[in-house]
Amino acid sequence: MIVRTIDEIIGTENEVESDTWTSRRLLLEKDGMGFSFHETIIYAGTETHIHYQNHLEAVYCVGGDGEIETVSDGKVYPIQDGTMYALDQHDEHYPRGGKTDMRLICTFNPPLVGTETHDENGVYPLLSKQPVGK
């Protein structure tokens, strides 16, 4: 059994920060679960361009507010506590923090190894050896 707390992650290499978000990576590829599991904070009033070309992601909001815009059709979806969205088509998108920081619980398939950050196109590199959907 794997048991971890957020306090064990904060301040370690498994807490990755940018100007617009912080990702606390609780499960990674090395844990052998077939997915990675993260707590991500999107800062209030910020916008981030993301396009996970190599990963599928499911996200559940557990606090705060914001929105997500899909680039392909310009649709904007409000996000608040209790909202789930899944990027099942490698959707290019813009998560935006609202009036308060948005706290999200995220899973990635294939799992992240832990060192990934977005490149200039909003893409995480594929570092996992596991194929998408397996």
Swiss-Prot record:
GO terms for biological process: ectoine biosynthetic process. Pathway: Amine and polyamine biosynthesis; ectoine biosynthesis; L-ectoine from L-aspartate 4-semialdehyde: step 3/3. The keyword Lyase applies. It comes from the Bacteria. This is L-ectoine synthase. SUPFAM superfamilies: RmlC-like cupins (SSF51182). Keywords: Lyase, Stress response. Its EC number is 4.2.1.108. It is an enzyme of class 4 (lyase). The keyword Lyase applies. GO terms for molecular function: ectoine synthase activity. Belongs to the ectoine synthase family. Gene3D superfamilies: Jelly Rolls. InterPro entries: Ectoine_synth, RmlC-like_jellyroll, RmlC_Cupin_sf.
